[in-house]
């Protein structure tokens, strides 16, 4: 179910959360990937434009947290980031971006953005390791050090695969790795302690 358009388009009442000193929202919705651990494609469908950055920023802060699930997978998301790179807004894209979608042009745009702290990516499978190395190299070319990279590492039942991905990421000195246990509440799969 979706919210009625007039409700969905309402600007949040941040006065309800006085400790929240940032704007929060989506520029794109959905995702074209069909990752087995992710519910977004079923819930939101394929990726599509959703808002412009001007529709979600606040005039009392320069902090903007984006919750897009795959912002680099749509030209609208990339264009919004390009425009944001020309502003003083400090970004946090709190969902992981795809390492496979970092081109030289995208790396240049990301390097011009102001970041609250990290640039976040994910490495959920071995096939993404080479993509991570490529993305890190392109970002370094444009002045972004590995210390600005935050990598979500999906932790699965396959410890051998998990460790291979972890050790591969540790080759990129300075990156921050966050182990994210696999869970699928729809199937009753919860992380083991």
Please report, for each region that a protein language model flagged, where it lies by residue:
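Local cysteine-cluster metal-coordination motifs and their immediate loop/turn environment
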Residues: 26-42
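Glycine-rich beta-alpha loop elements in corrinoid/cobalamin-binding modules
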Residues: 1-24
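Short catalytic/ligand-binding loop motif for oxyanion handling, primarily in non-cytosolic enzymes
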Residues: 5, 34, 44-46, 73-75, ...
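Auxiliary Fe-S-binding modules of radical SAM enzymes
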Residues: 154-193
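Core AdoMet radical
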Residues: 1, 39-135, 146-156, 176-180
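Extended, charge-rich low-complexity interaction segments
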Residues: 21, 33, 129-132, 181-186
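Short, flexible hinge/linker loops that cap or flank conserved catalytic cores
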Residues: 17-19, 29, 57-58
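Alpha-helical scaffolding segments of alpha/beta enzyme cores, especially the outer helices
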Residues: 79, 83, 134-141, 163-171
């Amino acid at each position: 179910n979706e919210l009625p358009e007039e409700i969905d388009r309402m600007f949040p009442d941040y006065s309800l959360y006085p400790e929240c000193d940032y704007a929060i929202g989506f520029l794109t919705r959905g995702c074209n990937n069909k990752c087995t651990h992710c519910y977004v494609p079923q819930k939101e469908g394929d990726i599509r434009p959703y808002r412009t950055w001007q529709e979600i920023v606040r005039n009392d802060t320069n902090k903007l947290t984006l919750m897009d699930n795959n912002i680099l997978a749509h030209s609208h998301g990339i264009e919004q980031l390009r425009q944001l790179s020309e502003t003083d807004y400090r970004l946090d894209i709190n969902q992981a971006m795809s390492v496979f979608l970092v081109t030289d042009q995208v790396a240049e745009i990301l390097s011009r953005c102001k970041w609250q702290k990290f640039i976040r990516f994910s490495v959920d499978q071995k096939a993404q390791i080479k993509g991570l190395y490529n993305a890190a190299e392109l970002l370094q070319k444009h002045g972004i050090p590995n210390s600005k990279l935050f990598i979500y590492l999906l932790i699965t039942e396959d410890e051998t695969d998990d460790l291979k991905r972890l050790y591969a990421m540790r080759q990129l000195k300075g990156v921050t790795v966050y182990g994210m246990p696999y869970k699928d509440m729809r199937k009753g799969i919860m992380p083991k302690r």
